[in-house]
Amino acid sequence: MKKKILLFLMMLFMPISVLADTIYSVSMNVNILEDGTANIVEKWDVKADSGSEWYKTMYELNNSELTNYKVLMDGSELKYKEWDVDESLNEKRGYYGINDTYKGIELCFGKGDFKRHTFTISYTLSNYVFNTEDSQVLAWVLFPETNVDYFSAEISSYYKFPDTLDVWG
């Protein structure tokens, strides 16, 4: 009985290691061109504890098309390849790609290892701003719901935004 109690107490006070990826920050710069296209650059400061890839969901592209997708890890450009979500950490190291799902696309890139890194993701989206009968509309989820310690977004354009611009978010 003493052994069982001792074992229980040891288990009770043993440190528990929880594996959880950490996204310290994501900063976005969106530059809107005159034709409604947007050039977007995101910087992710992250540390992986498990898994093999990072990804960003883009499930509602509607009439927009994604082009010029590139990823850098700590300033070094990764290589594009057809993405296979089932590949290992080693197989995804140094690569990025696009995963097509029934909901839309996921921008994927290999974690490489379980250390802290800065990833720079850049891409272009057509029809980022679209026309209606009486106005022009920008309606995007800049970053899907996730646990990010700090998020910032800066939107710039050839056009000077008036102080009376209606913005919701």
Where are these regions (language model features)?
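Lumenal/extracellular ectodomains and adaptor appendage modules
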Residues: 18-169
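Cleavable N-terminal signal peptides
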Residues: 7-8, 18
